[in-house]
C-alpha cells in the first residue's frame, strides 16, 4: 500500500514540485550518511552503525530517489525544448545518480560496486591468490563524505579529462613507460598462447615454436616483479569487470588478519578512463609502477575452442593461471598484414623481416573507423569510434581524446560490465579481420557457418587458420548484422530490460551541426511514433548509432566542450553517463541541442514540391510546397498562417492549458517544441509567462508587497512567517502580507488594514450578489469551475477562460461537434445565435445622447436668465459710476482755479 501511495505521489510531481521533493529526500539522507561516516572500530561496517528504523528509512529514501529519477526522465521528455528546465533536470539527475552510487558503495548492495584488492605474490609461491575470495575477507576504508549532498554539483567521479591528463603526464615523467606493438604470425606448432620471456633474453630465442617477439626494458628486478603481479591480478575476470565499470576510486582499508593470514596492504586502483577500457579489452594493463613493454597480438579460434592467454610474469609463473581463462582479441593492422602472414607461412621467413614489414605497413595505414566486437552470454557487442589517421602510433590515446572531447556523439544504452571469459562463450567462433578502412573483431554464433565444426578440428594447422580468416573477411564485406548492439559501460539493469524488449535496426549516419539539430528536434517531437513504428518487441539487442560530424567545428569551441564534458563525467554515477531512457538521447547530445537551438532562427527551410497537394483543415486551401504546411504529431496538416494565428489567439487569451489541435475531433496537445517553432518571440514570452502563472495557481505562494516587484515567493508558515523576495531582497510577513516586523506580532496597523479589507470585501460581495440577481439572464456560472460568465450577444458556444471548459449557453451541457444540429438537444436545435428573451422587469439604462441634451438645455437656460437679469444691472451701474467720476473731476478743477486767483 505504501508503494502505491509513493508511486502516486511521484507521478503527481510537477515541474515546480520535483526540486523540493528531491531536496527533502537528500536532506533526510544527509543525516543518515553522517551517522554512517562516524568514526568507530575498523571491523564495524557502515550499515551496522544505523539502527533498524534508520536502515528502513535509508531504503525508503533510496526508493523514493529512484522513482523520482524515472519521473524526471518523463519530465525531460515533455520539456525537451525548454533550455532552463532541461538544464535544471539534468543537474538533478547528476545529484541523484551520485547519491545513489554512494549509498550502493557504502551498503555493498551491488556486486559491481565492490572493489577488489590485488594480492601480493611471492617469488617462491606457485599459487595465485583468488581475487574473489580476497575481496570478501576484508572491509573497505571509511572515506569522509564529500560535498555531494550540497546544492552545488558534486565532484565524486575522478575520471575527468583534466585529472586523466595530469595523471598520465605524471606517470610518464616518473616511470617513462614505453610501449611497443608487434604482430607476428601463428604457426602450426604453437598453442595460441601468449608468453613473455624472463629477464634473460635467451629463453625466448631458444624456445621451440616461439611466435611472439616482446621487447622489455631493463629495470630493477623487484619492481618488474611487482608490476607483473599487478598485471596478473588485473587480468583476471573479477578485476577486469571492476576496472571497466564507471565507478569512483575507492581506497581499501588495511584489513585485520583472518585465519592466520597476513593482511594485504591498501592499494588504490587507477580511475577508469577510455584508455583503461581499451587497454583492458586489448589485454594491456598499465597499472605497473615500472617501465614495461606492452605487446598486442592477434589469435584465431575455431568453434568450441578456448584461447589460453598467459599473462606476463618475469618468474615463469604461467602454469598457475590456467583456471583463470579469458580471451583478448584485438587488431590494429591493415589488410597487408594478412598477406604478409601468408608469405611467411609459405616462405618460412624469419621474425625480423616480419617486424620490418609490419612497421612499413603501419606507416601507410589510414584508418577512418575503429570497431571491436565482444560477446557476453552469446550477445554480440560492438563499439565504434573515430580515430585520427595521423596518429597510428598511439591510436588508443587519440581514441580516448576524441571520445572525451565529444568527437563521436552516440546514443548509449547501459549494458553490464564485460567479463571477457571463455566460460561465457560456448560454441562461438572468434575471428580477427582487418581491412584498409575498418578494423573489426567479430563474434559469430555457431549456426552462422556450418563448416566451422570441420575447421575447428584442424585449427592447429596454419592453413586452416588462414582459410578461416579469408572466409570471415568475405562474410564481413556483406551488410552488418542487425542483431548487434553498441557496447556501453555501466549499470546492468537498463540493458537487460532493453535487450529483452526491443530490437532496433542498425542506423549509422554522419551529421553536420544543422542536421544533428533537426534529428534531435524530430526525436523530441515524435517519441511515440518512433516507439510504435521503430521499436519491435523481440528478444534481441539493439543498436542506434548517431555519429556527430565535427568537420565544421571551430577550434575555439573545444574548450567549452571540454568544460561541458568534465561536468558530465564528474557527475556520472554507477551507470556511467546518465541517459534519457524515454528515447535514448544522452546528456551530451541534450547539451548540444541546447547550444544548437539558438541557431534555429537563422535556419532556412528548403522548399520541396509534394507528391500530392495537401489541404489545410482550417482554410481548406491546397498547398503543394513543403514549407507552406506544418504537420502536427497527430498527423493533421495545417498551413503556417492558420496554425500560427490559432496559437496566437490561444496565447493572447491566456488559454495556455488548452493548446491542442484545432481539429474538432482531435484533442491532442501541441508540444512546446512545436509552439516554439510556430510562434514569434513576443508570443513565446507570453506563453512562458502564462504557463508560469497557471502553474503557480496550484502552489501555496505569496506575492511580494513591493509596488515595483511582481515576484511570487513560496514557503512560510506561522512559525517562520518571514519571507525574502529573491528579486528585490525585501522581507515581508507571510501572515499579513506587509513588510517584515520580526520580533513582534502583526501590529494594529496591519489589523486595521485587514479590517478595512474585510469591509471592502463584504461590500463588494454584496454588490456582486445584487448584480447577479438583477442580471441572471445575462450572467451564468461555468458548469465546471463555477466562475461567472457574462454574455450579451454572439454565439451560444461558450468557452470558460478559467478552466477552458466548452459548453452551450442555452442548455449548459458540454459542447460537442454538431451540438446545434443534433436531435439529442431539441431546445438548442438551430439556435446557435439565439438570444434569450428579456423580461419586463429589466429596465435598460437611458440612452446617453438624451442625457447630454438635457444637460445642455439646462446650461443654456441658466446662462440666458443670468444675462437677462445681469445686463440691466451692469448698464445702470456703469452709468452711475461714470457720473460720479465726472462730478469729482469738475469739483477738483474749480478748486485749483480758485487757489490761483487768490495768489
Curated annotation (Swiss-Prot):
Example of a GO biological process term: ubiquitin-dependent protein catabolic process
Ranges of biased composition (kind: Acidic residues): 217-232, 329-345, 451-466, 549-568
Residues reported in the UniProt entry to bind Zn(2+) 1: 616, 619, 639, 642
GO molecular function, one term: ubiquitin conjugating enzyme binding
EC code: 2.3.2.31
Reactions accelerated catalytically: [E2 ubiquitin-conjugating enzyme]-S-ubiquitinyl-L-cysteine + [acceptor protein]-L-lysine = [E2 ubiquitin-conjugating enzyme]-L-cysteine + [acceptor protein]-N(6)-ubiquitinyl-L-lysine
CDD domains: BRcat_RBR (cd20335), Rcat_RBR_RNF14 (cd20354)
Recorded superkingdom: Eukaryota
Catalytic machinery residues: 795
Pfam families given in the database record: IBR (PF01485), IBR_1 (PF22191), zf-C3HC4 (PF00097)
Binding residue positions for Zn(2+) 4: 733, 736, 741, 746
InterPro entries assigned to the protein according to its UniProt record, in alphabetical order: E3_UB_ligase_RBR, IBR_dom, Rcat_RBR_RNF14, TRIAD_supradom, Znf_C3HC4_RING-type, Znf_RING, Znf_RING/FYVE/PHD, Znf_RING_CS
Keyword Transferase found: yes
Residue sites binding Zn(2+) 2 per the record: 634, 636, 661, 666
Region (TRIAD supradomain): 612-832
Zinc finger (RING-type): 616-666, 782-811
Residues passing through the membrane, by range: 864-884
Segments of this protein annotated with the region Disordered: 115-137, 167-236, 284-366, 415-487, 549-576
UniProt KW DNA-binding keyword: no
Pathway field: Protein modification; protein ubiquitination
Annotated Zn(2+) 5 binding sites: 782, 785, 800, 803
Family: Belongs to the RBR family. RNF14 subfamily.
Job of this protein: E3 ubiquitin-protein ligase.
Protein name: E3 ubiquitin-protein ligase DDB_G0292642
Native source organism of the sequence: Dictyostelium discoideum
Amino acid at each position: 500500500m505504501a508503494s502505491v501511495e509513493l508511486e502516486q505521489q511521484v507521478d503527481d510531481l510537477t515541474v515546480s514540485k520535483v526540486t523540493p521533493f528531491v531536496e527533502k529526500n537528500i536532506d533526510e539522507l544527509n543525516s543518515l550518511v553522517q551517522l554512517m561516516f562516524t568514526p568507530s572500530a575498523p571491523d564495524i561496517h557502515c550499515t551496522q552503525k544505523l539502527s533498524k528504523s534508520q536502515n528502513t528509512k535509508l531504503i525508503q529514501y533510496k526508493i523514493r530517489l529512484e522513482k523520482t529519477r524515472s519521473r524526471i526522465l518523463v519530465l525531460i521528455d515533455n520539456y525537451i525544448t525548454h533550455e532552463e528546465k532541461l538544464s535544471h533536470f539534468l543537474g538533478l539527475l547528476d545529484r541523484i545518480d551520485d547519491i545513489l552510487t554512494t549509498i550502493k558503495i557504502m551498503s555493498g548492495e551491488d556486486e559491481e560496486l565492490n572493489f577488489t584488492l590485488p594480492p601480493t605474490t611471492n617469488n617462491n609461491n606457485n599459487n595465485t591468490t583468488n581475487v574473489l575470495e580476497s575481496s570478501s575477507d576484508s572491509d573497505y576504508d571509511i572515506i569522509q563524505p564529500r560535498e555531494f549532498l550540497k546544492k552545488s554539483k558534486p565532484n565524486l567521479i575522478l575520471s575527468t579529462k583534466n585529472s586523466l591528463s595530469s595523471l598520465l603526464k605524471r606517470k610518464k615523467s616518473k616511470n617513462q613507460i614505453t610501449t611497443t606493438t608487434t604482430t607476428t604470425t601463428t604457426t602450426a606448432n604453437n598453442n595460441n598462447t601468449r608468453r613473455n620471456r624472463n629477464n634473460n633474453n635467451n629463453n625466448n630465442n631458444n624456445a621451440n615454436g616461439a611466435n611472439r617477439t616482446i621487447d622489455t626494458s631493463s629495470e630493477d628486478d623487484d619492481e618488474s616483479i611487482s608490476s607483473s603481479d599487478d598485471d596478473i591480478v588485473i587480468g583476471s575476470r573479477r578485476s577486469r569487470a571492476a576496472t571497466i565499470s564507471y565507478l569512483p576510486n575507492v581506497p581499501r582499508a588495511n584489513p585485520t588478519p583472518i585465519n592466520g593470514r597476513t593482511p594485504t596492504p591498501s592499494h588504490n586502483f587507477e580511475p577508469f578512463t577510455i584508455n583503461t577500457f581499451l587497454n583492458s579489452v586489448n589485454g594491456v594493463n598499465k597499472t605497473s609502477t615500472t617501465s614495461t613493454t606492452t605487446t598486442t597480438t592477434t589469435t584465431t579460434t575455431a568453434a568450441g575452442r578456448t584461447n589460453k592467454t598467459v599473462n606476463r610474469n618475469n618468474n615463469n609463473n604461467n602454469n598457475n593461471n590456467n583456471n583463470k581463462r579469458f580471451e583478448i582479441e584485438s587488431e590494429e593492422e591493415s589488410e597487408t598484414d594478412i598477406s604478409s602472414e601468408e608469405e611467411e607461412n609459405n616462405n618460412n621467413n624469419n621474425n625480423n623481416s616480419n617486424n620490418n614489414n609490419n612497421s612499413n605497413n603501419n606507416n601507410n595505414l589510414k584508418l577512418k573507423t575503429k570497431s571491436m566486437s565482444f560477446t557476453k552470454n552469446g550477445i554480440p557487442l560492438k563499439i565504434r569510434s573515430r580515430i585520427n589517421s595521423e596518429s597510428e602510433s598511439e591510436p588508443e590515446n587519440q581514441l580516448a581524446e576524441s571520445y572525451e572531447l565529444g568527437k563521436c556523439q552516440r546514443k548509449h544504452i547501459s549494458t553490464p560490465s564485460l567479463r571477457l571469459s571463455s566460460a561465457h562463450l560456448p560454441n562461438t567462433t572468434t575471428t580477427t579481420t582487418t581491412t584498409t578502412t575498418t578494423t573489426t573483431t567479430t563474434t559469430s554464433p555457431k549456426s552462422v557457418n556450418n563448416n566451422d565444426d570441420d575447421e575447428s578440428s584442424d585449427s592447429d594447422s596454419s592453413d586452416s587458420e588462414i582459410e578461416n580468416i579469408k572466409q570471415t573477411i568475405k562474410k564481413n564485406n556483406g551488410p552488418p548484422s542487425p542483431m548487434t548492439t553498441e557496447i556501453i559501460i555501466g549499470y546492468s539493469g537498463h540493458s537487460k530490460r532493453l535487450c529483452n524488449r526491443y530490437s532496433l535496426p542498425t542506423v549509422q549516419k554522419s551529421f553536420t551541426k544543422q542536421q544533428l539539430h533537426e534529428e534531435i528536434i524530430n526525436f523530441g517531437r515524435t517519441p511515440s511514433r518512433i516507439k510504435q513504428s521503430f521499436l519491435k518487441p523481440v528478444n534481441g539487442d539493439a543498436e542506434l548509432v548517431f555519429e556527430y560530424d565535427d568537420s565544421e567545428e571551430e577550434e575555439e569551441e573545444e574548450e567549452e566542450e571540454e568544460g561541458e564534458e568534465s561536468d558530465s563525467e564528474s557527475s556520472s554515477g554507477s551507470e556511467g553517463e546518465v541517459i534519457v531512457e524515454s528515447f535514448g538521447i544522452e546528456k551530451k547530445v541534450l547539451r548540444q541541442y541546447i547550444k544548437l537551438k539558438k541557431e534555429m532562427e537563422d535556419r532556412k527551410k528548403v522548399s520541396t514540391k509534394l507528391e500530392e497537394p495537401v489541404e489545410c483543415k482550417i482554410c481548406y486551401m491546397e498547398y503543394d510546397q513543403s514549407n507552406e504546411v506544418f504537420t502536427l504529431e497527430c498527423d493533421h496538416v495545417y498551413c503556417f498562417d492558420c496554425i500560427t494565428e490559432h496559437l496566437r489567439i490561444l496565447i493572447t487569451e491566456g488559454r495556455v492549458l488548452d493548446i491542442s489541435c484545432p481539429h474538432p475531433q482531435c484533442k491532442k496537445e501541441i508540444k512546446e517544441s512545436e509552439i516554439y517553432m510556430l510562434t514569434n518571440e513576443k508570443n513565446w514570452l507570453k506563453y512562458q509567462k502564462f504557463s508560469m502563472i497557471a502553474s503557480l495557481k496550484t502552489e501555496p505562494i505569496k506575492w511580494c508587497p513591493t509596488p515595483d516587484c511582481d515576484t511570487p515567493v513560496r514557503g512560510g508558515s506561522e512559525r517562520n512567517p518571514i519571507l525574502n523576495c529573491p528579486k528585490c531582497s525585501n522581507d515581508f510577513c507571510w501572515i499579513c502580507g506587509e513588510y517584515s516586523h520580526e520580533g513582534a506580532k502583526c501590529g494594529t496597523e496591519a489589523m486595521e488594514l485587514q479590517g478595512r479589507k474585510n469591509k471592502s470585501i463584504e461590500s463588494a460581495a454584496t454588490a456582486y450578489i445584487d448584480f447577479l440577481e438583477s442580471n441572471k439572464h445575462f450572467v451564468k456560472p461555468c458548469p465546471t469551475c463555477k466562475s461567472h460568465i457574462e454574455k450579451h450577444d454572439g454565439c451560444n458556444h461558450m468557452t470558460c477562460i478559467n478552466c477552458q471548459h466548452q459548453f452551450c449557453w442555452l442548455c449548459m451541457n458540454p459542447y460537442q461537434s454538431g451540438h446545434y444540429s443534433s436531435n439529442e438537444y431539441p431546445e438548442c436545435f438551430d439556435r446557435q445565435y439565439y438570444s434569450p428573451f428579456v423580461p419586463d422587469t429589466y429596465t435598460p439604462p437611458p440612452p446617453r445622447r438624451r442625457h447630454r441634451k438635457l444637460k445642455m438645455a439646462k446650461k443654456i437656460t441658466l446662462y440666458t436668465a443670468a444675462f437677462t437679469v445681469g445686463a440691466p444691472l451692469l448698464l445702470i451701474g456703469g452709468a452711475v459710476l461714470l457720473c460720479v467720476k465726472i462730478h469729482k473731476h469738475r469739483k477738483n478743477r474749480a478748486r485749483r482755479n480758485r487757489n490761483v486767483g487768490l495768489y
